Amino acid sequence: MDTLHEHEAGNLYEEQRVDRVGDALTADAGDDADTLEDGQQQQQQQHQQLLGVNRQMAILLDAPQEPPMAVFPARGGLNGPPRLRKKRSFYTMVKPSPPCESQEPEMCLLLASVTRAMRQVREDQRGEYFANYLVENMTSQNYPNGVGLPQHWGEF
């Protein structure tokens, strides 16, 4: 076991000695800047080769990091720490009003009077009565310039 540690220590010393000899030969004072520059140049050359060979790869490599952080400020961007969004429940969004017998849907005056009059007619005659009532009462005398009538579907 001791021989293993001695062997590893010997290799470590050997690597340091090789670095010093290389530094002395290149006269770069041991900062290894030349090897870093060589590595960067080699990476740039490989990158340029990829760009020339495959346009799709070039587009992917040159694309900015996605998604941009400014799009999601809740993740800790400009507004600070992330906040959890409250999830909405379909059951609590709208509360139904209590059923009321006297409450009728909003409608124009003509339809309100038709429905009141139709309550007094037998069920089998209601369709005919409804049409006749509208023909008789939907006149320009009763509703001058269309005041009181709905202007479009769903208004009343």
From Swiss-Prot:
Which InterPro entries does this entry report, sorted A to Z? Soti
Specify the glycosylation sites in chain numbering.
137
Pfam families the UniProt entry points to: SOTI (PF17079)
An annotated GO BP: sperm individualization
User: Which keywords appear in this protein's UniProt record, sorted alphabetically?
Assistant: Developmental protein, Differentiation, Glycoprotein, Spermatogenesis
Q: Where is this region: Disordered?
A: 26-48
- Give the protein's biological function: Post-meiotically transcribed gene that has a role in late spermiogenesis; required for actin cone progression during spermatid individualization.
- Identify its protein family: Belongs to the male-specific scotti family.
Q: What is this protein called?
A: Male-specific protein scotti
